[in-house]
Amino acid sequence: MYAVVKTGGKQYKVAAGEKLKVEQIPADIGAEITLDQVLAVGAGDQIKFGTPLVSGASVKATVIAQGRHDKVKIFKMRRRKHYQKRQGHRQNYTELRIEAIVA
């Protein structure tokens, strides 16, 4: 069984037992969270789509880590104008383990 969930403005296809890195969710490590925005649920060749959400469906997950992605380096330059700008960015993430899909 799998589900398509929406969290942090992005959509993820998940199944029970998988690990998933999503945009940061303010929760403690080991906390049980529920993802309520389920867009689709499927098992085998049967798929149930929501309009826009599947009613009564949710995904149970456990927070296993909070971290930061690798640094992304931004470099801007204007040729012949002596303009250079450097910037870096590290995005926070939450790593989840999908425990169960309730549909």
UniProtKB/Swiss-Prot annotation:
The keyword Disulfide bond does not apply. NCBIfam families: L21. Belongs to the bacterial ribosomal protein bL21 family. Pfam families: Ribosomal_L21p. Part of the 50S ribosomal subunit. Contacts protein L20. GO terms for cellular component: cytoplasm; ribonucleoprotein complex; ribosome. Coiled coil: none annotated. GO terms for molecular function: rRNA binding; structural constituent of ribosome. PANTHER family: 50S RIBOSOMAL PROTEIN L21, LARGE RIBOSOMAL SUBUNIT PROTEIN BL21M. This protein binds to 23S rRNA in the presence of protein L20. This is Large ribosomal subunit protein bL21. GO terms for biological process: translation. Keywords: Ribonucleoprotein, Ribosomal protein, RNA-binding, rRNA-binding. InterPro entries: bL21-like (IPR028909), bL21-like_sf (IPR036164), Ribosomal_bL21 (IPR001787), Ribosomal_bL21_CS (IPR018258).
